[in-house]
Amino acid sequence: MGRRRQRVDPAAGARAGALPEAIAALSRSLPSGPSPEIFRRAKFDRPEATSALWQLLFRVLSPLPAGNALASLALEVQARLVKSALCSQGYPRLALAQLPEDGSQGSRELLLALSWLLARGPVPEQMLAQARVPLGDEMTVCQCEALASPGPPAPHMEAEGPVDVRHVQWLMGKLRFRWRQLVSSQQEQCALLSKIHLYTRGCHSDQSLSHLSVTEAEMLRDPEGGQQVSGAGAAQNLDLAYPKCLHSFCTPGMGPRTFWNDLWLVCEQPGLLPGDWAAPLDPGGASACSLLSPFRALLRTLERENQRLEAVLAWRRSELVFWRWMDTVLGTCAPEVPAAASQPTFLPWVPERGGGELDLVVRELQALEEELREAAERRRAAWEAKAGGCGRGPEWSAARRASREAVEKELGALQQCWERDGGPAQPHGPHRLVRREDGAAGDRDLRAAVVIRTLRSQEACLEAVLRRLQGQCRQELARLVGARPGLIWIPPPGR
């Protein structure tokens, strides 16, 4: 008798096939994402998946460029940074802090931490926005204070001995020179950018932009700005402008959309160009340089960005399948003890041999606290006695007037911040620079005059704070000079 064939549910088969596709889409959307096999092994807490997940969490929590020195840290250092970053963000599971940092175990716990980050915010979209290729001329406009910089903080260096004042003055002069250099380079860049936008007006197929960006203008340079490509004989100056021979093969026009399409066709089929143009593109020819190598690299980068965007869209479509699978992963974990809810989420490890030193530090801190309290009481009593003796003198009136003005300024600044926070959302993030003659602006557009006016007001506030701090420094220097009778203080000339 033949074996009875088992009936297969098509819906169950589709659900089983959707899970690998969802995990593969998530892997492609993350920076240096591991293979889907790593996720499967992490579900069963296999140790070979631990190092890849530590590195993935480090890339997600510290979005650094690939060439950065911090991106090639040791696995132990990356694990410590991941632990501190998750602790600062409020990760609730205590088991992560107890994992070894050598990558020997804990892949399932790392998978849970990654899913916690995915549930808190759009991580793939954030990674895609940080690594996107800007084709337009952009400027970052941000009127909010940066609370923290991405990545671990820079190490703080202390001077080993006394520092010469002349060395400090030399450093200040060097810093001032570099600052002026930066400002002049920014002004020159803005002038060149304005010329490019003015000269390429009307060349863009998108009527809302009307002009080309620097990247697009680089693709359409004039013959005088062409590259020098060494051929078999003498060097020849090739025209990198739009080749006229492409008009018979490709779509006509100088718009960037047709230009990108035609450029891709040229990269794929160099035979469309005449001999002078096709020789540098022939990989088997005598030319050592490729004319369109920057173009080809840019197109490949855009292709990779499009692939990541498609992966993010595929991940969003199959996200529910992944979360159902994560429910099964969470079900295989041992439940945490109830007493851990009242404990802090992160407990630093303290060696046993340092217990005596820690007690000594505690006693020293308590003694220092008592001294500070006594000094504060003495200073408060002296201030009250001084205020009671000169309550109606001119010095007291001037001090009271200065204090009132300072308090009014601080209150005015706080009130402006409060009104600004309660009003419409402030501009944040990169904005594309567009030159418009008609002056029309959309709802989400930001005028340059508004940004300049805001920056000037912020500059005035910062200058006022700088003058106040400089006055405090002069008073402190005068006090130090008065304490040393043999010291001659020659202030620098006014700038």
Swiss-Prot record:
Stretch list, region Disordered = 417-440
* Residue ranges that the Swiss-Prot or TrEMBL entry lists as coiled coil: 355-387, 452-480
Kindly name one Pfam family recorded for this protein. TEDC1
Question: Cellular location of this protein?
Answer: Cell projection, Cilium; Cytoplasm, Cytoskeleton, Microtubule organizing center, Centrosome, Centriole
Q: Which domain of life is it from?
A: Eukaryota
| UniProt cross-references to InterPro entries, sorted A to Z | TEDC1, TEDC1_dom
- Cellular-component GO terms for this entry: centriole; cilium; cytoplasm
* Biological process terms in GO annotation: positive regulation of smoothened signaling pathway
Keyword check for Cytoplasm: yes
Query: Which key words tag this protein in UniProt?
Result: Cell projection, Coiled coil, Cytoplasm, Cytoskeleton
On assembly, the entry states: Interacts with TEDC2. Found in a complex with TEDC1, TEDC2, TUBE1 and TUBD1.
Q: What does this protein do?
A: Acts as a positive regulator of ciliary hedgehog signaling. Required for centriole stability. May play a role in counteracting perturbation of actin filaments, such as after treatment with the actin depolymerizing microbial metabolite Chivosazole F.
Q: Which PANTHER family match?
A: TUBULIN EPSILON AND DELTA COMPLEX PROTEIN 1
* Protein name as annotated: Tubulin epsilon and delta complex protein 1
Q: Which organism is it from?
A: Homo sapiens (Human)
